[in-house]
Amino acid sequence: MGIVVIGAVFVDIKGYPLSTYIPGGRNAGRVEQVHGGVCRNVAEDIANVELRPTFVSLVDDTGSGQDVIDKLAKHKVNTKYIEKVPDGMGTWLAVFDNNGDVCAAISKRPDTTPLTRLLEEKGDEIFADCDGIAFELDLEKDTVKQILRCAKKYNKKVYAAISNMSIAMERRAFLQEIDCFVCNQQEAGLLFSDEYDHMAPEEMCRTLAANVHSANIPCMVVTMGGEGAVYARSNGESGVVPAKKVDVIDTTGAGDAFFAGTVIGLTYGKTLPEACEIGSRLAASVICTAENVCPRFRPLEFGLNIPVVD
């Protein structure tokens, strides 16, 4: 059944300045609207590596919601478990500076409580034959509990990302039950109540290794933008993954692509450093385009001997 991805759908509204960006001032520019959401992007990224994920989510009961389903289905994502409900999609509004980085953002989260009922009713058929599970840690607590319960029942690996760290902090205890957790440097600082922005990769790696050991977190990967990423396991394994050197067009979705690549690697037999390397390549492919998902790849390009199913 492939990798099961569980999370919210957002509509991303992105503003780009046409000339030098003036904080607090009026800026002429262009505005784009695209389908987004961490796990929606992750599902499409996995599908773009010619794997066939299943996306469990909610969309609005409108034409916009149907558009999301249609686009994912076109990319060969299994959309059987996407339900249409009122207020099923969130909105993410972001303004970018001249370097392609987000300088201001506001998000309105959707109501994801119906996911708990969906997993209660159909959890067995969703998870029994899947290859692995990827989800957003900032879903409702009952939803997270349901995912972890099913993962334990069917002995499936579970991987988590986040879109809102303040909400995810309330789920911190669940990290001990997750096979690998991926976040960025700023989010890691919030998670461990510390300041990491000044740290170089080597220092960040040592700090992360100490933190995952003391917090009993099985495995964690922290992305550091242009400086790459660091990883650490509670058993002492740790390392640095350098970033790929590319021209930055738009950083939206790069973290999601990194997470997708890491999940793909860990699910299909790669070591943690090899999985992070796949994540780094997918992230680079997103950064150098205006899209928020990666272009098409084949599994063999990442050393994955998985048949492509059409």
Q: Language-model segments: which ranges?
A:
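Short glycine/proline- and charge-enriched loop/turn segments
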Residues: 20-28, 184, 239-243
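A glycine-rich helix N-cap at a beta->alpha junction
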Residues: 71-86
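Conserved phosphate-binding/catalytic loop of the ribokinase/pfkB sugar-kinase fold
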Residues: 84, 94-132, 137
